[in-house]
Amino acid sequence: MDRVDGRKQGQIRPVRMTPNYNKYAEGSVLIEVGDTRVICTATVEERVPPFLKGLGKGWVTAEYSMLPRATGSRTIREAARGKLGGRTMEIQRLIGRALRSVVNLEALGERSLTMDCDVIQADGGTRTASITGAYVAMIFALNRLVEQGMLEKIPVSDFIAATSVGIVKGRPVIDLCYAEDSVAEVDMNVVMTGTGRFVEIQGTGEEATFSREEMNQLLDLAAAGIEELNKVQRQVLGDIAAKIG
């Protein structure tokens, strides 16, 4: 049986990345995963957080937000509420952790990269799309530092991408759209490297449980999907991709 949008069980949504989407940022990309769209920008600053001052190493962090009408009904801006929501804080920490897992912070030197992931349209998988797009924006920014002679080489050991998987109506599926995510019995986000190593797995039963066998099926789906995402990343980066690792 096909899914709500006609996809097969192990088929990710169409992925498109538009590089240099923001003319001011050191690195940027608009990532589109189905109807989910996220603008990812990288900002380089020649300073580090106070806890890293004088240690000779850099930092990579992330911020995440959604436009009020990124969803079906308008949501109040978090700035208007006066504080970040728990979901937002969790997602931006996830993005930062994922990117730092492959960055040599010592080789980066005492400078910071701030990744801004702004969702302009949400249809499921915004956090995983943010990670996949932010990685590309980060590489563009680091390559600029290399070209300017500020870094000897791109201090990144591997590719990073992420996707969602879940169990919907008893079937393991990949890259859930909102309609699927809202009724999923199991929801899981998976972040992996280009060499197939796991960075993070977030899995939850929604009023349901799942077996070790089902979890393995979900991870196999995620690994195959992330391999496809890596191919898109390589295509967008072009010759820069060969400088990674």
From Swiss-Prot:
Gene name per UniProt: rph
Organism, as annotated: Desulforamulus reducens (strain ATCC BAA-1160 / DSM 100696 / MI-1)
Lineage of the species this protein comes from: Bacteria, Bacillati, Bacillota, Clostridia, Eubacteriales
PROSITE patterns, per the entry: RIBONUCLEASE_PH
Enzyme class, broadest EC rank: transferase
InterPro entries assigned to the protein according to its UniProt record, in alphabetical order: ExoRNase_PH_dom1, ExoRNase_PH_dom2, ExoRNase_PH_dom2_sf, PNPase/RNase_PH_dom_sf, Ribosomal_Su5_D2-typ_SF, RNase_PH, RNase_PH_bac-type, RNase_PH_CS
Function of the molecule: Phosphorolytic 3'-5' exoribonuclease that plays an important role in tRNA 3'-end maturation. Removes nucleotide residues following the 3'-CCA terminus of tRNAs; can also add nucleotides to the ends of RNA molecules by using nucleoside diphosphates as substrates, but this may not be physiologically important. Probably plays a role in initiation of 16S rRNA degradation (leading to ribosome degradation) during starvation.
Name of the protein this chain belongs to: Ribonuclease PH
One MF annotation (Gene Ontology) recorded for this entry: 3'-5'-RNA exonuclease activity
Family: Belongs to the RNase PH family.
One Pfam family in the UniProt entry: RNase_PH_C
UniProt keyword RNA-binding present: yes
Biological process according to GO: rRNA catabolic process; rRNA processing; tRNA processing
